[in-house]
Every structure is written in C-alpha cells, then in structure tokens.
C-alpha cells in the first residue's frame, strides 16, 4: 500500500473552475454508456469523427473470392493503413496477429452462402465471444423487404440487446436482395428501421440521388459500403460524394484489395475521408503512391 508518512493535504482544487467532462459528439451516441462510447471512439477518429474500415469478411458466404484467397499474404499488409478491420472471428483468430492492435468489427451474422437465399441469416456469434476477442463492434445484415426481413430484424434486435449489457455497439448492414432497387427511398427506409431498432452504426450503399436525405433521416452514423469493384477514380469519387453529403466514413473491401495497388488505394481513401481531399487530388495521390 502507499506510504502513510508525510501525507500532504491537497491544495490545487481550482475552485474557480467548474469540473469539465468533454461530451461525446458522435452523431446520436451522446447518451450511450461509457464502455460503448469508448469502443466507438476507437472506430471513429476523434479529430475528424470519421472512419476508414477495411472489410474482408466476404468469405463468410462467398468463400475464397478474388483477393481473399490468402488473407495472410494479400490483406495483412493493409492492416496498418486501415482505421478498423472488419472480419469474421475465424479469420481474426487464425490470421490477424494480436499485435496488429487495430479496432475490430466482427461479422456476427451468417449461416447462408451464395448458393442459397442470401437474406436467410442467423446470429452467428455470441456476445461473450465478441468480448473475449476484444472487438469494438459486431455487425449483421438487415434485409428490409426480403423474404426473411423479419428474421434479419430479429437478429439486429438480439445483438443490440446483448450488446447493451456489455457495452458493445452493433452495426447494421443494409443488405439488398436479388430483386431490390438500390435507391434513396429503399435505403432511407432500411437505415431508419435499423437505427430505430437500436443499431449504433449503419452501413449502407451510396446512391447518386438523395444520399444526403438518407444521412439526414438516420439518427446514427452512416458508413458506406464499397460494393463491387470500380475503377479507382470512380471509387474515390463515390467516397468523396458520400463524405461530402454527410457520411461518417467508408467500409470498403473489393475496391481496396482488388485494386492493382491496394496500399496506394487505401492511402487515397484515407485522404478523402480524413483530409477532405477531392476525388481528383486523391486519385493523383493514388497514382504517385503506386509508383
């Protein structure tokens, strides 16, 4: 125990200064518990309020798709350039070194494949395991308007309830069924429902018309999915448009790891998200970094 000799009375109480507790300013998250805010503060940069996530969880239903055949070779070099890693618990345990020291968003839904109906998912991760793996959030699909809409919403509710008990945020990922139209009306509905169910982060797709309305109508942070592989200049333009219209970051996979120069592309995306660079300037950075 501390030495009891020569204990001095405190004097520097600054009685003229009220106690300060800096508020947590992430959109819609000011009333959350300390532990959940702490995890969210690791996901979102404290200075910019934004994030660049690297998604490589595709194997949970696609298997070893292009670019993810050997995650230890193709994806591991990208870890240091990402703010957050998004993956499954299987890949985290088998491939990601603990010393990587990056916040992790764990895929928490699954039980389907590309050979069956994609929207037929179940919760595929216990909250105990998410805590055991020191993750900063869990993520699950929500399929509004699909055959299994009800089950996917129940999955989100289950994860939110379990997460609230341990201070673990839930990210709802707005999946799109085979016959659904990707437009502002649909994503406004899907993102709002997910937020109303309690999800603390929403991952959705960027749309050319009305994206700012999607963001405005969602009371928690939105990060955009990268979606299918685009030419680098187009992917950076999508990032810039989304950030300019209010997105809180990106969660990109194929547009990073399927690029001819993934590290250069990651740096260019970081420039858009955290440094407000235009798509043109970010593309110039990409070209210079790939040399």
Swiss-Prot record:
Predominant cellular place of this UniProt entry's protein: cytoplasm
Annotated keywords: Cytoplasm, Schiff base, Transferase
UniProt record similarity statement: Belongs to the DeoC/FbaB aldolase family.
Known role: Involved in the degradation of phospho-AI-2, thereby terminating induction of the lsr operon and closing the AI-2 signaling cycle. Catalyzes the transfer of an acetyl moiety from 3-hydroxy-5-phosphonooxypentane-2,4-dione to CoA to form glycerone phosphate and acetyl-CoA.
Organism: Escherichia coli (strain SMS-3-5 / SECEC)
Reaction catalysis annotation: dihydroxyacetone phosphate + acetyl-CoA = 3-hydroxy-2,4-dioxopentyl phosphate + CoA
NCBIfam families: PRK08227.1
MF-aspect GO terms: acyltransferase activity, transferring groups other than amino-acyl groups; fructose-bisphosphate aldolase activity
SUBUNIT field: Homodecamer.
Name of the featured protein: 3-hydroxy-5-phosphonooxypentane-2,4-dione thiolase
Gene of this entry: lsrF
């Amino acid at each position: 125990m501390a030495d009891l000799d020569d204990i001095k009375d405190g004097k520097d109480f600054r009685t003229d200064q009220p106690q300060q507790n800096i508020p947590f300013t992430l959109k819609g998250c000011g009333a959350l518990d300390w532990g959940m805010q702490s995890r969210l503060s690791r996901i979102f940069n404290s200075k910019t309020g934004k994030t660049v996530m690297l998604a490589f969880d595709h194997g949970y239903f696609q298997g070893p798709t292009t670019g993810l055949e050997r995650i230890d070779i193709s994806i591991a070099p990208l870890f240091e350039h990402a703010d957050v890693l998004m993956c499954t618990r299987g890949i985290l345990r088998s491939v990601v070194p603990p010393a990587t020291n990056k916040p992790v968003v764990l895929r928490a839904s699954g039980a389907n494949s590309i050979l069956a109906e994609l929207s037929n998912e179940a919760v595929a991760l216990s909250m105990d395991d998410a805590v055991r793996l020191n993750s900063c959030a869990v993520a699950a699909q929500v399929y509004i308007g699909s055959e299994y809409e009800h089950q996917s919403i129940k999955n989100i509710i289950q994860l939110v309830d379990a997460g609230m008990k341990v201070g673990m945020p839930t990210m709802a990922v707005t999946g799109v069924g085979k016959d659904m139209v990707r437009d502002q009306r649909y994503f406004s509905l899907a993102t709002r429902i997910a937020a109303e169910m309690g999800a603390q982060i929403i991952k959705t797709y960027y749309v050319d018309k009305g994206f700012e309305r999607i963001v405005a109508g969602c009371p928690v942070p939105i990060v955009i999915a990268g979606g299918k592989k685009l030419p680098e200049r187009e992917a950076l333009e999508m990032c810039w448009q989304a950030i300019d219209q209010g997105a809180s970051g990106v969660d990109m996979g194929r547009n990073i790891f399927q690029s001819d120069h993934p590290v250069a592309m990651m740096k260019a995306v970081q420039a858009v998200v955290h440094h407000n660079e235009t798509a043109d300037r970010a593309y110039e950075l990409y070209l210079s970094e790939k040399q």
